[in-house]
Amino acid sequence: MSFKEVSTENGVLTPLITIKEKAYMIIEGLNEEEIELLNTRLPKLSKKALARNRYSNIVPYENTRVRLDPMWKEACDYINASIVKIPSGKTFIATQGPTSNSIDVFWKMVWQSVPKSGIIVMLTKLRERHRLKCDIYWPVELFETLNIGDLSVILVKVYTLTSLNEVQVREFELNKDGVKKKILHFYYNGWPDFGAPHTFSLLSLTRYIKSLSYSPDFETAPIIVHCSAGCGRTGTFMALFEILSQTDDSTSTSKFEVDNIANIVSSLRSQRMQSVQSVDQLVFLYTVSQELLQGKEFLLPQL
């Protein structure tokens, strides 16, 4: 798939209204392209599997869906989660905000996906516009334990990142059969449903998580990211991560251009439906790219 989204002159995008018009055309094209995938890649779901979905119209593709490990002895191996590999090579698990019916399988997925230490990125508030968007799936009090069979989840620390008030970080310890794993949970609450967040805060957070994800403790684990449905905001985060990977890599042989964005989003959508869902989210990616190409500095937040 190839789009010529926005013309540039000296690395600067055309006016915002043109970007929005182009973004609308691209989203329309992506939606048409996705219809073909829906006809061939949707899984056949049992009633038990369907009960684990937050939204009936957002499900993983059969060829990219996460399957629960047989060690859990679940009657159904289904969870609403997709394995997504971005062009620069990093692997994500894009998933829905857990429901009361899927909290247990969510943590089982986390355990089986993370060798030693892992990262969860939460991009939705629990409630938005008076609607439940995500259930509380973690122990709330310090040192409280959530038990899921022989798997336990313990909250060991809560803190914020300096200069990013929208982010709360929780550290969990997972225990199973004497083996312990560390999970860092980044809760970003500055993103409106279907809209776009403040550029500085999300870009700074994404760059921080990108740096952390390549550190020795985390580099082999996929980044687990969710919003409510696990598509719009989740896809935008993954696209932003890829844009940063291309623009931050001084060794890259190919220069990043805004024309790459549509292909990045198309790649994501081929693995998780509706990744980057709205025109505003696509415009946000253009805006960030423009600021990066103009050399604007975004400092890493500190603990």
UniProtKB/Swiss-Prot annotation:
Active-site residues, as the UniProt record annotates them: 227 (phosphocysteine intermediate)
Keywords of the record: Cell cycle, Cell division, Cytoplasm, Hydrolase, Mitosis, Protein phosphatase
Function of the molecule: Contributes to dephosphorylation of tyrosine 15 of cdc2.
EC number(s) from the headed UniProt entry: 3.1.3.48
Xref: InterPro entries: Prot-tyrosine_phosphatase-like, Protein-Tyr_Phosphatase, PTP_cat, Tyr_Pase_AS, Tyr_Pase_cat, Tyr_Pase_dom
Occurrences of domain Tyrosine-protein phosphatase (ranges): 24-292
Compartments reported by the entry: Cytoplasm
Family affiliation: Belongs to the protein-tyrosine phosphatase family. Non-receptor class subfamily.
The protein's enzyme class: hydrolase
Protein name: Tyrosine-protein phosphatase 3
Keyword Ribonucleoprotein set for record: no
MF terms (GO), sorted A to Z: protein tyrosine phosphatase activity
PROSITE patterns assigned to the protein according to its UniProt record, in alphabetical order: TYR_PHOSPHATASE_1, TYR_PHOSPHATASE_2, TYR_PHOSPHATASE_PTP
CDD domains: PTP_fungal
Principal subcellular localization: cytoplasm
One GO location term (cellular component): cytosol
SMART domains: PTPc, PTPc_motif
Keyword Hydrolase set for record: yes
Organism: Schizosaccharomyces pombe (strain 972 / ATCC 24843) (Fission yeast)
Any one GO biological process: signal transduction
Entries under Pfam families matching the protein: Y_phosphatase
Catalysed reaction equations from the record: O-phospho-L-tyrosyl-[protein] + H2O = L-tyrosyl-[protein] + phosphate
Gene encoding the protein: pyp3
